[in-house]
């Protein structure tokens, strides 16, 4: 781990410690891991390691909190198919700003903002910082194979997209996963694990998994579970602005994690997600 990685790890630990809206596994939510998913090489597989949903319980009272409410209001604002141009209505733009307003007020984003200002990576004034966040996350761009703006960092990471009608791309958020599973649109296929990754644990806040959505398959994805929208938004913004690398190794709480962050034209987030490396014994 480099000195920069250690510094970032300490900062992410501070974000974690101040994530007051994080849910507690086994208390505020419960998941059912069931079996291991089939090994896919990017193609659908009939084998299903899970006959039941991933989420067996979530205390939805948390969704009444400001950042959760604002986040959830954004999830129905997008066309999932890449190649379908996105049209942002004035109401949707207002919802984007409402979400940013709610996140900027949280302890986690205040910590991230202060650090980014110290590193001269973000403007100090709130208005300028909001504009920076909007550009990184919500400005539309054309994904590979499309000639018109059909994607954004927020849509890809937090909402999910489909490519060619049979492949799910992005979709790295537990709230969207839970809500779509509740509607019957998600079929959880089981957890993913290989020789280099830790065995999954229902009491940990991270999971690699396989699922289908809207007739498409996500052969392998990884997500945080139970964390607040502001924690993920702050974490990924930090990694995007700080790290010239596309994979940054961090250690916080009980986890060694790689945060993958691909830029799009150096201006927007292409994708970003956690990869569990090791669970630390404390």
Swiss-Prot record:
Limits of the EndoU domain: 4-278
One Pfam family it belongs to: XendoU
Single GO molecular function: RNA binding
Cofactor(s) needed by this chain: Mn(2+)
EC number: 4.6.1.-
Catalytic activity reported: ribonucleotidyl-uridine-RNA = a 5'-end dephospho-uridine-RNA + a 3'-end 2',3'-cyclophospho-ribonucleotide-RNA
InterPro entries in the cross-refs: ENDOU, EndoU-like, EndoU_C
Keywords: Endonuclease, Hydrolase, Lyase, Manganese, Metal-binding, Nuclease, RNA-binding
Active-site residues annotated for this sequence: 156, 172, 218
UniProt enzyme class: lyase
General function of this protein: Endoribonuclease that cleaves single-stranded RNAs at 5' of uridylates and releases a product with a 2',3'-cyclic phosphate at the 3'-end. The UU and GU sites are more efficiently cleaved than CU and AU sites.
UniProt record similarity statement: Belongs to the ENDOU family.
PANTHER family: PLACENTAL PROTEIN 11-RELATED, URIDYLATE-SPECIFIC ENDORIBONUCLEASE B
Subunit structure, interactors included: Monomer.
Protein's recorded name: Uridylate-specific endoribonuclease B
Natural source organism: Danio rerio (Zebrafish)
